[in-house]
Amino acid sequence: MDDSPIKNWIPYKLTNDNDGPQCHWLNTFKETFTEPFFDGTIRKCRSIDSQHLLKNCVSDLAMLEEWAESLPDVEPNAIIFHTSRCGSTLVSQLLSLSSQNIVLSEVPFFDDLLRMRYKYPINELELLKLFRAAVKFYAQKRTGHEEHLYIKTDSWHMFFYEQLRQIYPTVPIILMYRDPNEVYRSLKKVPGMQSVAGMIEPELLGFEPKEIAGLHPDEYLASVLEKFLAQYHHIIKSDGDFLLLNYNEPPLKMVKKITEISNTSLTPQHLTFMEERVQFHSKKPGELFSEVQGPASLPLLNKAIDLYHSLNERT
């Protein structure tokens, strides 16, 4: 497969035209996936593309399954869900320090596929097949060292738990979370898509359309955090292969727990790399990490706080 014309290529963007969904392709040139978020990897690879004067490569989405069939790839060792601002970015960065690990951190194309039902009519079974095929491209054995695969989803992908569990019935689910007061303050300071009404389809998050009409932005954010934690409770009632990780645990301890449940191991060299990396900011690797404690709990977070404490009783 080393001489395959699609080796190192990934589907990175989904668009629509009169013929239906179109898949845009990107050559990764054996670049390692070590950016905090995968859109950073895409920018890096597109820059290399422009230097090679490559043309835009587009195909019908249906080709995804056919082309993925013969790819040598790595099966997932764990799927990481998170409630935002809870240490998942740092954990994924620490995991990516090993050349044996492929870490896919919030891949835009995965989000395009999972939310495609809100834009295009598509059969659920076909969508699951497309998602599995897409993962195979991202999980290619491109250097020969890859043995483990970790998929860190976008925060709202926890609501696709049932679909992802259908695709990967035996893969451990990691549930990362944090005190809602701290998540709320962080998202107020630097908003994410999930914290702004209308950016993510309300029904995906479990809202009725009328439920969010007229909500103040602060109330909306508090409701989203409540929905996230309620979904975690649903998952742990439905699934027997999960790991709850609270942000208040040391990052290295969290990584060790993830490797244990995913039946992987840490080499002495990987541990050394992690001990160095953990001193720095997860999203800004060159910046030393520091954290300022905020004010006491807000009343609008009371329901989320109750759900948070209930989760703590399960760890």
Language-model regions: role of each:
Residues I102, H145, L175, Q194, ...:
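Secondary-structure transition/capping residues
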Residues N123-A133, M193-G206, E287-S297:
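A polyampholytic, Gly/Pro-enriched intrinsically disordered region
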Residues M1-E69, K210-L221, L225-T315:
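PAPS-dependent sulfotransferases, especially Golgi type II membrane carbohydrate sulfotransferases
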Residues D3-H234, E249, ...:
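PAPS-dependent sulfotransferase catalytic domain
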